[in-house]
Amino acid sequence: MGWGVGPASELASRRAGVDTFVYGLSRDDGLFYPSKVGLMFGEDRQPETELAAYWRVSQNLHSLLDRGLDPLSVLIDRSHEKGMDFIASLRMGAVPGIGRPELTVANGGEGYVHPEVRSHQLAVLEELSNDYDIDGLELDFTAAPGGSGLSFPLGTGPTNAPLMTELVRSVSSTIRARGGQLGVRVCTTPALPASLSLDCCPGLA
């Protein structure tokens, strides 16, 4: 059960006044939960033939699934038991499970210019919002998943920024439709979208 209870319990036991647990649940090569719309880490390969750390992650995920437990739900529940809000953080440059890797910037595609990429990422965010008892979503534009954090090809950001704005508006609509209180964090500083040639923050309006 270390996968689910360890990080949350450790933070709470330090008595440091921590009241929020932000969990990065994706890499370029997979999501750390059994997604119905995306790719779970390790599903498309054999992690035991790679780094020991990858094997450990895959084994931890499957050890819970084999017992009928959802790894993400376990972590969320433990955070709530310890009095912490749970924020699900998604790397926006990663689209594991899209089925067409050639659409990503890392593989020569145009990233979020493609409707398929935007639809896929929105489906993952809707799944997190509707299927899990999270307290907030973080749209992480800063972490580089597997070495590529680009949403659009270099030099095309200003032209394509409205596409990202519309995607964030769609996320906002999903959050409002869910009801209750669910926070969304898009960027860590006001300067970040400008540095990435994105105009994403107005999408929350």
Language model segments and positions:
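Short, solvent-exposed turn/loop segments enriched in Gly/Ser/Thr/Pro and often Arg
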Residues: 24-29, 90-95, 140-145, 188
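Catalytic domains of carbohydrate-active enzymes, especially glycoside hydrolases
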Residues: 4-35, 39, 49, 128-137
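Aromatic- and acidic-residue-enriched segments that line the glycan-binding/catalytic groove
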Residues: 31-51, 94-109, 142-158
